[in-house]
């Protein structure tokens, strides 16, 4: 640890900051560390006060529920109002400038990617455009009849071509006939011309859908660009490819504008427990903004180097030059107020507030983009987009706004350059969402919902009221539907339409694309102009929903409806333990134990913060700390209320450890648990998450995970 400006700084982090982060900006190392020291001195006590207020509120709520159980909504509302938890509604109107169209105007999928895996981050950044042919060919989006042939399977290819033709007929219909009849696509002064054997030549039913083209070269390669609902679709023409040869109009691919925005995550999807980990995470964010991030990997026996894609060049319909971004617009998610990091310590040995460090590093990295120091531009509007999670109520949002203002002042940035995305994932924020938005009215560019974290906080808030519903039953509760509807209602009432994102949560089954196509269209239909997906392929398939649904039109309709009743958020999701059969209890305990262990063993034992973890039935689910929080809180709640006992929990976890080990058999570096449960850091961490769940502030998992991961790293 190096002593810098009165701070003890981990050598990995110091080397990154001084050798990379500050390499081409007008900020010295002394100034950076002095700024961090001032921010820590100013905000750490305020953050500590906010966390103490959380604990005070929770203690009072616990006491009330012990006396009243779930109580009535009327009694609960009065109590929470008297407590200062439930605040008067506000009627804010946001006034935010310098917002990129990807956030303000273009509805579309949003990726969330761990910052600790540069290859994944590059994949996400480049997922602005995705191959529909690949997405259809390689997933269950199209039913598959038998095994695919090695190499290119022409039967499957024909199936993909037919599906693409049908999609084009639906979304970009011709004035007459079908895209299946096309023999050639070309541009003319009158727009798109499609040659067909049956009808001669024909144009689009709506000529305004033609956006541009790339001229056909000597080998017959070119492209046609179409647009619908703000998104673009490219018909790629290349008769020299295997697919183009098979296609009836020499089409090699249909490429969709897909992941319009991407959140580069420093929080729930990463395992960053020291300065080395933090430097890795920050390096990814910096490299994306500078445009020099690369990742090498082996593919087909060769070393492949991946880097960010360039912009895409076309000739517009009017003959002018047209440049479209080749990369997703990137936001960065910082840590919440409750987290600290040992990467930097104060003179008395205290860890600094991780969110303060994140904000400063995120903004300094943003200077490279704001000052045009890289080959590409992220924010053409001149903003840095920071998503702030785990905030409890408007006072904490106001604290973040003040922090961002202090960072701007220190770096000489215009006021409100640092925009804020508000994660609506804690109950005190949900019930006071209008007041939260009011505190950030000049910065807010995003609110979203997330079932898992929000349910985790719901469980912890009502922990002493009684045994909570099973995890699956939570999805049909009144409070959850109200939460999803009200988030949209409040945001639109505050003027988010055509200015900011209203987001919905993650599709958690990366392999279940047919199911996603069927179900996730509900998000744009609910008024969300962005929703989370687990992969670039999922982004391409989810983009179909935004091509089908006019989200701006949906938002206009929703804006005229009555705002969902806030009182319905106060219905406490508890049940009578006697209504749960022994089989129900066993299945729920086994399911959650397996989920907890499957995630924790990767986090603690392997340093993986987000991955596809098979559930008890073997279905791969995208897991991060949010999924862990709800599972650990549910089991802890049932333990407290006697639905299960400690011995049963321990026995179940021991059995499930063997199941998880078997599911991961053969994976390089996997630290098996069942052979020695007592010495397994991962197994002991999983048990601690349950047995300390009642006492852990807000039911968060980070402190337990971090401590056990640090032990595992030290022992490695």
Language-model regions, residue ranges each:
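N-terminal-proximal low-complexity accessory segments that begin disordered
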Residues: 1-70, 74, 78-87, 94
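Catalytic alpha/beta active-site cores
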Residues: 2, 77-78, 82-399, 406-413, ...
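Hydrophobic alpha-helical scaffolding
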Residues: 3, 7, 22, 26, ...
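Catalytic or ion-translocation cores adjacent to nucleophile or general acid/base/metal-coordination motifs
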Residues: 4, 13, 354-355, 378, ...
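Generic recognition of stable, solvent-exposed alpha-helical segments in well-folded globular domains
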Residues: 8, 12, 16, 27, ...
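Generic, well-ordered alpha-helical scaffold segments in large soluble proteins
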Residues: 12, 16, 20, 35, ...
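Intrinsically disordered or highly flexible coil/loop and linker segments, enriched in small
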Residues: 22-27, 42-49, 63-70, 85-89, ...
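Acidic, glycine-enriched catalytic cores built around paired aspartates
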Residues: 77-81, 85-138, 142-149, 153, ...
């Amino acid at each position: 640890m190096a002593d810098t400006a009165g701070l003890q700084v981990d050598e990995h982090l110091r080397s990154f900051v001084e050798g990379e982060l500050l390499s081409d900006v007008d900020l010295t190392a002394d100034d950076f560390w002095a700024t961090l020291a001032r921010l820590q001195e100013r905000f750490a006590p305020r953050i500590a006060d906010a966390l103490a207020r959380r604990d005070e509120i929770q203690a009072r709520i616990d006491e009330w529920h012990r006396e009243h159980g779930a109580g009535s909504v009327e009694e609960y509302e009065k109590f929470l109002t008297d407590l200062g938890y439930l605040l008067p509604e506000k009627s804010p109107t946001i006034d935010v400038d310098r917002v990129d169209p990807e956030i303000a105007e273009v509805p579309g999928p949003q990726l969330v990617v761990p910052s600790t895996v540069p290859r994944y981050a590059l994949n996400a950044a480049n997922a602005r455009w995705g191959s529909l042919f690949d997405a259809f060919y390689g997933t269950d989006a199209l039913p598959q009849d038998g095994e695919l042939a090695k190499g290119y399977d022409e039967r499957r290819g024909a199936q993909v071509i037919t599906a693409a033709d049908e999609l084009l007929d639906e979304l970009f219909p011709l004035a007459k006939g079908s895209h299946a009849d096309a023999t050639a696509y070309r541009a003319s002064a009158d727009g798109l011309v499609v040659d067909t054997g049956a009808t001669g030549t024909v144009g689009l039913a709506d000529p305004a859908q033609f956006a541009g083209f790339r001229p056909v070269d000597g080998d017959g390669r070119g492209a046609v660009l179409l647009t619908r609902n703000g998104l673009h679709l490219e018909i790629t023409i290349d008769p020299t490819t295997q697919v183009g040869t098979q296609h009836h109009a020499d089409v090699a691919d249909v490429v969709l504008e897909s992941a319009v925005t991407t959140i580069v995550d420093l929080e729930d999807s990463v395992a960053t427990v020291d300065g080395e980990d933090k430097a890795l995470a920050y390096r990814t964010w910096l490299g994306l903004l500078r445009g020099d991030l690369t990742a090498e990997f082996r593919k087909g026996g060769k070393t492949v180097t991946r880097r960010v894609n360039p912009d895409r060049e076309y000739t517009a319909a009017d003959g002018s030059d047209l440049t479209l971004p080749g990369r997703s617009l990137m936001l960065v998610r910082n840590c919440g107020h409750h987290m600290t990091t040992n990467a930097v310590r104060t003179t008395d040995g205290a860890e600094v507030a991780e969110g303060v460090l994140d904000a400063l590093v995120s903004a300094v990295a943003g200077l490279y983009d704001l000052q045009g120091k890289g080959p590409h531009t992220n924010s053409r509007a001149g903003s840095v987009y920071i998503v702030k999670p785990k905030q409890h109520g408007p006072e904490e949002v106001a604290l973040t706004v003040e922090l961002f203002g202090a960072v701007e002042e220190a770096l000489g940035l215009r006021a409100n350059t640092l925009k804020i995305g508000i994660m609506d994932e804690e109950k005190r924020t949900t019930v006071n969402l209008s007041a939260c938005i009011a505190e950030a009215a000049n910065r807010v560019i995003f609110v979203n919902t997330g079932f898992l974290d929000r349910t985790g906080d719901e469980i912890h808030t009502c922990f002493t009221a009684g045994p909570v519903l099973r995890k699956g039953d939570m999805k049909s509760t009144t409070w959850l539907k109200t939460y999803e509807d009200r988030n949209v209602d409040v945001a639109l009432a505050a003027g988010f339409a055509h200015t900011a994102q209203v987001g919905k949560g993650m599709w958690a089954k990366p392999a279940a694309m047919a199911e996603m196509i069927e179900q996730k269209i509900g998000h744009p239909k609910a008024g969300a102009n962005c929703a989370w997906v687990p992969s670039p392929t999922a982004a391409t398939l989810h983009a179909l929903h935004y091509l089908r649904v006019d989200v701006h039109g949906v938002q206009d309709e929703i804006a005229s409806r009555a705002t969902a009743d806030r009182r319905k958020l106060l219905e406490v999701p508890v049940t009578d333990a006697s209504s749960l059969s022994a089989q129900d209890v066993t299945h729920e305990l086994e399911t959650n134990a397996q989920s907890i262990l499957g995630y924790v063993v990767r986090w603690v034992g392997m340093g993986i913060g987000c991955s596809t973890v098979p559930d008890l039935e073997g279905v791969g689910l995208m897991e991060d700390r949010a999924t862990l929080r709800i599972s650990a809180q549910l089991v802890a709640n049932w333990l407290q209320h006697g639905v299960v006992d400690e011995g049963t929990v321990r026995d179940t976890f021991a059995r499930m450890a063997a199941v998880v080990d078997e599911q991961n058999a053969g994976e390089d570096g996997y630290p098996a648990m069942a052979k020695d449960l007592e010495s397994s850091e991962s197994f002991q961490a999983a048990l601690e998450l349950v047995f300390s769940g009642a006492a852990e502030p807000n039911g968060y998992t980070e402190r337990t995970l971090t401590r056990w991961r640090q032990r595992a790293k030290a022992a490695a």
